[in-house]
Amino acid sequence: MKRGIRRDPFRKRKLGGRAKKVREPTAVNSFYREASLPSVWASLRRREMVRSGARPGQVLSSGRHTGPAKLTNGKKATYLRKIPRFNADSGYSIHSDSESQAETVHGLDGCASLLRDILRNEDSGSETAYLENRSNSRPLESKRYGSKKKRHEKHTIPLVVQKETSSSDNKKQIPNEASARSERDTSDLEQNWSLQDHYRMYSPIIYQALCEHVQTQMSLMNDLTSKNIPNGIPAVPCHAPSHSESQATPHSSYGLCTSTPVWSLQRPPCPPKVHSEVQTDGNSQFASQGKTVSATCTDVLRNSFNTSPGVPCSLPKTDISAIPTLQQLGLVNGILPQQGIHKETDLLKCIQTYLSLFRSHGKETHLDSQTHRSPTQSQPAFLATNEEKCAREQIREATSERKDLNIHVRDTKTVKDVQKAKNVNKTAEKVRIIKYLLGELKALVAEQEDSEIQRLITEMEACISVLPTVSGNTDIQVEIALAMQPLRSENAQLRRQLRILNQQLREQQKTQKPSGAVDCNLELFSLQSLNMSLQNQLEESLKSQELLQSKNEELLKVIENQKDENKKFSSIFKDKDQTILENKQQYDIEITRIKIELEEALVNVKSSQFKLETAEKENQILGITLRQRDAEVTRLRELTRTLQTSMAKLLSDLSVDSARCKPGNNLTKSLLNIHDKQLQHDPAPAHTSIMSYLNKLETNYSFTHSEPLSTIKNEETIEPDKTYENVLSSRGPQNSNTRGMEEASAPGIISALSKQDSDEGSETMALIEDEHNLDNTIYIPFARSTPEKKSPLSKRLSPQPQIRAATTQLVSNSGLAVSGKENKLCTPVICSSSTKEAEDAPEKLSRASDMKDTQLLKKIKEAIGKIPAATKEPEEQTACHGPSGCLSNSLQVKGNTVCDGSVFTSDLMSDWSISSFSTFTSRDEQDFRNGLAALDANIARLQKSLRTGLLEK
């Protein structure tokens, strides 16, 4: 009833903790879990046992990995707790009343009942004769609880009590035996018997299974051995009390840990063969001495080693070198729980053997207490004592194991049945309450008509209907019994084989026991094993040395081959370097040659570029020259037309004055009338009279052939009066095109002429604009003679007649420019020509053109000379009162008369005679007109040839 009282608060706390948000579904889940876990666990165990059968030795490991295990032994449960490292004061009672040890899972109830039925059914018919000699286990429980109150006192429990409590506690620890043993101190159960050798004597199958499981722990134990074995402490057997004695004195002064026992493999009194094994762990060492595997607790060695009557211990002084560590059995300190939960079948194989050993172990401890109390007793004495007791213990073990088994099975079965009935009743009642609550909830929800809540309620009802308590699947003992039947039969066979083997071993020990077996110790076996291992290592090292030598020889050969190859490669590299050097020299020579050629090519390119630039400049100069010549041709044509008109007027005047009236008055009046008519009708009146034009031609022609033009000095720039400006501005549309062309090309002409003067040494032109000139128009006449370079161009452009016409035009043009300069007909221009050009120009003229020009001039002069002298004064008056105003010898400059050294002087006029004027006939007039027409034709031809030349360029 204490157990039920303890578990109810735990259930309430668990329900409250899980129902923080929604209590009803959580409560349903908890009820379902509590009701279904036993059946689930039982079905899983049954399925696993039927499928696995008799497997090799695997041990069930449980505990904190799958939840706390609930094990029953009379009234109280035993709870396991993992202690990773042992301390001297870390003893705790197994049967603690704290709330932390009250946590159980219903799933393990099935395991406990399963083991109880197995043990009860197997031993019910064979060992009933000894049941009346056993006492009930409840007084042992009261003793156990009483010992907790007297924890600081030393107790010596009788041997019978030790046996009974040991067997009963062993039966309590069956479900999670292996994991609990591996997590607790090994000092609680150190005995003189070895379970491994005991299994070997009675059952080869169990021994094989156990050995296979032990072999799996070897790798895990190796690491812990090297880290945790105390240096200098020999492996000695320390025989602690049984499990009941540990519980009776949990906090005694010797400081042993009294948690759940760890079953160690120890030495049998009469082993059949040599089996040296050592199992070590962080705080325990299992040393094999001869045929023994004995355990030691390092906590006992660390403390003062105070022993009580119930705790016999021995510490023989043995050499640490005599302890062979050939094998390690991993059954201590948390190794097995890492392997997980193993199968039940392997556990069931070892259960009966454990139970049969514990009784004999308890007696062995009591009988050998005097022997092991002395810490200085040697190991051979301990072996001899074990051998003397061998026969007696072998006889007792079969009877004692079955008595303890049956007593424990009865106690556990009674408690389990009562508890299970209570649990089933409680679960059924809770299920009914849940169904009622669901019905009420469904009625409330039906009013709201919420489909989702109704669906959830139907699902909850379906889940509750599936519960084992509702469906009637609570009783599974029959199924478990059927599933365990083959295991029971196998267990009976193993028991029979175990008895036979024990009998055979006892006989062999009696007959074949050598006389000197007592003198054999662990040192001999350790030395032999060490010798064998060293021999094996020596052989392996020799083999490895031979292999290394062979490899070394091969490597030496490879090195020699590599040296030869390196020599070959070095020679090849030298040859390559030499060839590369030669190629480099050749390439350098070629590169220098190419550089020289490139430099020459660059020089040629630069020279060609310079020539191209000069040619372009010459082309520009030629273009400017052609434009200037075109302008001069236009101007000459205008002058020719003006001359024709003036000559026609003169001839008409002469024809009118044939009546020989007073020449001065008539001539003057007629000339004034003609001039007035010309101003009214002609938009471009003549600039000069025929006399001035002929005078200019004669003067220019004679001056050009007689002396160079450089003798002409710079003259004063005379400001023209208003009449001259009017004449210049009123030249009309006849020469407006020429003016536009000259104005547009004036800057280029100046720059081109300046360049040509600097390059060729030809004439230089300087334009001086008058400060007082109101007309801003710049008029540049073509006032230069033909250079040497232009005569071949004229020859290329036109045939011989064109050359003659061009020469005539140029010569007359030069005369016009000079006379215009003297008479101030145009904007003052300072002209200077070199002597070379002045002398070379007549030489380039053709003879035919000179003859024609001179003949034409002579004819004109003769015609003019025939005019009577009486016309001298009227002509001068006409020239002075004419529209140009600048034909007179004196010009009005700011009210002052400035004398000009022009050609028109009184000396020239005095040469003319009046009689010569009268001899001017109509035949001469016709010749003059024909000459002017030929001049016009030549001018037109020259202009056409110049235009074609420009188009060709």
From Swiss-Prot:
Residues 383-413, 483-618 form a coiled coil. The modification Phosphoserine is found at residues 124, 670, 754, 798. The keyword Lyase does not apply. The keyword Ubl conjugation does not apply. Keywords: Coiled coil, Cytoplasm, Cytoskeleton, Phosphoprotein. Residues 1-21, 145-154 have a biased composition (Basic residues). It comes from the Eukaryota. One of its GO terms (cellular component) is cilium. Residues 277-287 have a biased composition (Polar residues). Residues 1-22, 52-72, 126-189, 268-287 are annotated as: Disordered. It is found in: Cytoplasm, Cytoskeleton, Microtubule organizing center, Centrosome, Centriolar satellite. Transmembrane segments: none annotated. Residues 169-187 have a biased composition (Basic and acidic residues). GO terms for biological process: protein localization to centrosome; substantia nigra development. Negatively regulates centriole duplication. Negatively regulates CEP63 and CDK2 centrosomal localization. Interacts with CEP63. This is Coiled-coil domain-containing protein 14. It comes from Homo sapiens.
